[in-house]
Amino acid sequence: MELAMGKVNEVLFMNRGEGESSYAQNSSFTQQVASMARPALENAVKTLFSKDFHLQALNAADLGCAAGPNTFAVISTTKRMMEKKCRELNCQTLELQVYLNDLFGNDFNTLFKGLSSEVVGNKCEEVPCYVMGVPGSFHGRLFPRSSLHLVHSSYSVHWLTQAPKGLTSREGLALNKGKIYISKTSPPVVREAYLSQFHEDFTMFLNARSQEVVPNGCMVLILRGRKASDPSDMESCFTWELLAIAIAELVSQGLIDEDKLDTFNIPCYFPSLEEVKDIVERDGSFTIDHMEGFELDSLQMQENDKWVRGENFTKVVRAFTEPIISNQFGHEIMGKLYDKFTHIVVSDLEAKLPKTTSIILVLSKIDG
């Protein structure tokens, strides 16, 4: 079953709640990524004060916010930098309006439960902060024209609106048999389909934001990417490769129909810096102020016990993959699947899992 656009919008979300497998409890890696990207966000906020906006309120949106602590850090960082600039410039009191966006399946209840006074402060502070939820797909319009000064998105833009089109032959045969993402054994058409889908979706994202962001407004985007030119390089596909192996083992045990594996392709693409740069320049609505890639260990390397490291990695992966994986293969076998995944990860630790590459992209809306 290929995932079409409407279906992806229904099943793409992080594990809900605050339990052992929840995203809220297993977002330590994305917190590391956000920490690395924080200077870019701080600089973007400072830059906004150098532009002639005559601000009374700064409107900011966090797109694909999920329900972990990263969103709270974004709010706190933005608010803190606004307070600092207001003191430096002796400007009038500003207000901060933050819009938190994700798809309809997102756990907005857990998200808003976590919005303590430590995050948003109180309305008598230098920069009063107001927060609203905005459910919907960021691949389309979410806000009125020229209403946003700052857009932030972390580890969301690499998700696609649907599984790439054209991954079955005219005879209806799966072209990426036994895999759920690009791999070394995938034919060229699979790689081309994934890049084409990402190009289409990222262009839609930029087009929607070009209408919503004010001229000279900023976007800070952090997404999973790759350094290698080859999208099948283990650096960018190892998580999906190991998951496909785990699923295939359950197929061999008769617990999953082989056809379900052969027809499933994860709606996600990890682009290179060159691919992202090319799409932004082709769109022409934004200038690239800053762009860089950086690497982080995929596992908590300070933990010596390889089983603990493997189990921790599985929890992180399960938190962001279980909803969409269980929709395809069934909720009842998720325990067995992720146990199998842990064993595969631990065995691969002997060969050392590759580092994870992330991309920071800072854009300014072109005036005119």
Curated annotation (Swiss-Prot):
Residues annotated as site: Involved in substrate discrimination: 152, 224, 268, 316, 331
Family: Belongs to the methyltransferase superfamily. Type-7 methyltransferase family.
Cofactor binding remark: Binds 1 Mg(2+) ion per subunit.
Record keywords: Magnesium, Metal-binding, Methyltransferase, Transferase
Binding site for Mg(2+): 176, 262, 264-265
Gene transcribed to yield this protein: TCS1E
Coiled-coil regions, chain positions: none
Source species, domain of life: Eukaryota
Pathway the protein takes part in: Alkaloid biosynthesis
Catalysis: reaction(s): theobromine + S-adenosyl-L-methionine = caffeine + S-adenosyl-L-homocysteine + H(+); 7-methylxanthine + S-adenosyl-L-methionine = theobromine + S-adenosyl-L-homocysteine + H(+)
Protein name listed in UniProt: Caffeine synthase 3
GO biological process assignments: methylation
Species in which this protein is naturally found: Camellia sinensis
Residues at which caffeine binds: 30, 155, 158-159, 224, 320
Cofactor(s) recorded in Swiss-Prot or TrEMBL: Mg(2+)
